[in-house]
């Protein structure tokens, strides 16, 4: 059994349902300290975070390449629906099954072993390497990576390159990397009416009827054209609620929750302003609160993307695709202190599902891609 596979299995065996790390990071600290990493644990509201750095010969003058990952996993769902126990790593049909196998314990194991091999082969490596690991990525993500980034920013520390170990491969291992992500902004809209008997509408004011024209306009609105890296911005309703459950009462208010996934072609302020304009045009009496979960970020082609593309091609023979599709990731926080952030990891078809798995044959190539990137950029 390879060292990467063994470490992946050990990590899967720890039931680190968010935000519980289950001492996964303690295991990583043992491995990393043994090869010269300085390890710092940053805890916040029950969340465990790790910042581990191994300085190169050039010290702080050299480039720093970091790996970002998360030890927490999503809940398993009904355990009885799994073909094998979700926290007992199980081999079947050439696959390794277990919660976190693809998202993202194999990636963490791959980078740790890649680091061990890299340091052994290049004991005088010029650049520095680091790992930023959290147990709060699958949850609210308020006490995880963002807290480490806050601490690093306060100390004036930056990264030159960051590889996030998210499972980005789509159909074939290595076929896609993420060089950016859309921003995410949610709104909670409450439209006020006047409650009354449904037989006497002239004595009431139905907030659903008042809301409907504005809702139709928001649905039909063309927010932007996108750009060469991002698709057009989207607006979607996630929740719609009004009424008491009775059939003879006109409700007193209607509540809508919605979400923008937006590109660098739009801004938070611009989108918020346009929503308010549409609501105000309809003369609505409303309250609207906003939550910005993350801003869009983009890493144009450069040293990191070139190194990763070459590493993937040399290892797999695949010309990978740069993409910004999908949801948000912790890359949105890291982009504050790192100009080159790219995500790469295994196939994502089974993540968050019953019987999550990774192809065993992909585990060593994953580690090898990470090592090739280290060798190109900081050896």
Curated annotation (Swiss-Prot):
The keyword Amino-acid biosynthesis applies. GO terms for biological process: diaminopimelate biosynthetic process; L-arginine biosynthetic process; lysine biosynthetic process via diaminopimelate. Its EC number is 3.5.1.18. It catalyses: N-succinyl-(2S,6S)-2,6-diaminopimelate + H2O = (2S,6S)-2,6-diaminopimelate + succinate. Pfam families: M20_dimer (PF07687), Peptidase_M20 (PF01546). Pathway: Amino-acid biosynthesis; L-lysine biosynthesis via DAP pathway; LL-2,6-diaminopimelate from (S)-tetrahydrodipicolinate (succinylase route): step 3/3. It comes from the Bacteria. Binds 2 Zn(2+) or Co(2+) ions per subunit. PROSITE patterns: ARGE_DAPE_CPG2_1 (PS00758), ARGE_DAPE_CPG2_2 (PS00759). The keyword Magnesium does not apply. GO terms for molecular function: acetylornithine deacetylase activity; cobalt ion binding; succinyl-diaminopimelate desuccinylase activity; zinc ion binding. Its cofactor is Zn(2+); Co(2+). Zn(2+) 1 binds at residues 70, 103, 166. Catalyzes the hydrolysis of N-succinyl-L,L-diaminopimelic acid (SDAP), forming succinate and LL-2,6-diaminopimelate (DAP), an intermediate involved in the bacterial biosynthesis of lysine and meso-diaminopimelic acid, an essential component of bacterial cell walls. Homodimer. Belongs to the peptidase M20A family. DapE subfamily. This is Succinyl-diaminopimelate desuccinylase.
């Amino acid at each position: 059994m390879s060292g990467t596979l063994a470490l992946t299995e050990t990590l899967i065996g720890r039931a680190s349902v968010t935000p519980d790390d289950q001492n996964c990071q303690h295991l990583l600290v043992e491995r990393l300290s043994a090869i010269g990493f300085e390890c710092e644990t940053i805890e916040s509201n029950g969340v465990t975070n790790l910042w581990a750095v191994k300085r190169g010969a050039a010290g702080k003058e050299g480039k720093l390449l970091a790996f970002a990952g998360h030890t927490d996993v999503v809940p398993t769902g009904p355990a009885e629906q799994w073909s094998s126990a979700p926290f007992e790593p199980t081999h079947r049909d050439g696959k390794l099954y277990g919660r976190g196998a693809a998202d993202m314990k194999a990636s963490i194991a791959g980078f740790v072993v890649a680091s061990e091999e890299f340091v052994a082969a290049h004991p005088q490596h010029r650049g520095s390497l680091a790992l930023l690991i959290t147990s709060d990525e699958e949850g609210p993500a308020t006490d995880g990576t963002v807290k480490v980034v806050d601490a690093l920013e306060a100390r004036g520390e930056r990264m030159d390159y960051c590889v996030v170990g998210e499972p980005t491969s789509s159909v074939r291992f290595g076929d896609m990397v993420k060089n950016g992500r859309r921003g995410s902004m949610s709104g909670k809209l409450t439209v006020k009416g006047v409650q009354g008997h449904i037989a006497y509408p002239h004595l009431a004011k139905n907030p659903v009827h008042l809301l409907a024209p504005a809702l139709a306009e928001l649905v039909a609105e063309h927010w932007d054209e996108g750009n060469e890296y991002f698709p057009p911005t989207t607006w979607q309703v996630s929740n719609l609620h009004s009424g008491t459950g009775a059939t003879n009462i006109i409700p007193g208010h209607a509540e809508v929750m919605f979400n923008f996934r937006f590109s660098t072609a739009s801004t938070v302020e611009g989108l918020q302003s346009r929503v308010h304009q549409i609501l105000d045009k309809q003369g609505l009496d409303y309250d609207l609160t906003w939550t910005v979960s993350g801003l869009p970020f983009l890493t144009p082609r450069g040293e990191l993307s070139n190194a990763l593309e070459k590493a993937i091609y040399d290892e797999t023979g695949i010309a990978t695709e740069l993409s910004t599709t999908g949801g948000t990731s912790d890359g949105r926080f890291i982009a504050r202190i790192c100009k080159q952030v790219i995500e790469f990891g295994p196939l994502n078809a089974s993540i968050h599902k019953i019987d999550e798995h990774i192809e065993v044959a992909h585990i060593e190539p994953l580690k090898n891609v990470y090592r090739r990137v280290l060798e190109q950029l900081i050896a």
